[in-house]
């Protein structure tokens, strides 16, 4: 899969290194945490103005849907992660391709900037794909973020495809706004509203299960994101199939890496 070229002003030093197939370490080794945070914040604020939470496609045209997830672990003083991307056929729900990439995490954890830790592995995994998904679904958030720049949204500017964020746990954007439980019926939802703006939805995919938290990534509307989440959820789980399979693959890959 060919990744979209992003104008240089939108790239931090570490992302430039990733795009050149170098290690993330070459881009961040000379930056302090405060310098990184300043650079990351600048990029988020620049990109947020380019978010398009509207449908740029027709559901009937979707053929391949990808699920993306990462799993972390530590070894000594180092932190590692594996990213897995699983592609399924939209009609048959059969797996058509899966790829993974393992690497060391070089960016320290900073609240609100998780995408910068995960993007290097996601981009390298996506570059391994032999087919091109029509839609990417991330185990995480998109618009449901203090600056609307969760991983699902941030990655869209590189993948140049519609993206959705589907999280299993609720992320309090402002540390005070909670969500209202949807009715106990499949397809029921409540909007997550912060300061009068809809950031996402709590969606119940099955009766008698916990809701998942849907937010647009980019190039898709919230209504369509919820419709697709329901279409891609099978009876075995309340999590949509693409990210459920990606989650399973990351756990398998992580255990294999730990034992090696």
Could you say what each language-model-derived stretch is?
Residues 32, 36, 40-43, 47-51, ...:
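C-terminal binding/interaction regions
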Residues 76-132:
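A glycine-rich, hydrophobic loop/mini-helix early in the fold
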Residues 63-74:
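Two-metal-ion RNase H-like nuclease active-site motif
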Residues 18-30:
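Short, Lys/Arg-enriched N-terminal segments with co-localized hydrophobic residues
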Residues 51-61:
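A short acidic-Thr-Gly-centered motif at the start of a beta-strand
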Residues 122-153, 159-161:
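Catalytic-site beta-strand/loop segments enriched in glycine and acidic/polar residues
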Residues 145-198:
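A contiguous pocket-lining binding segment that forms or flanks enzyme active sites
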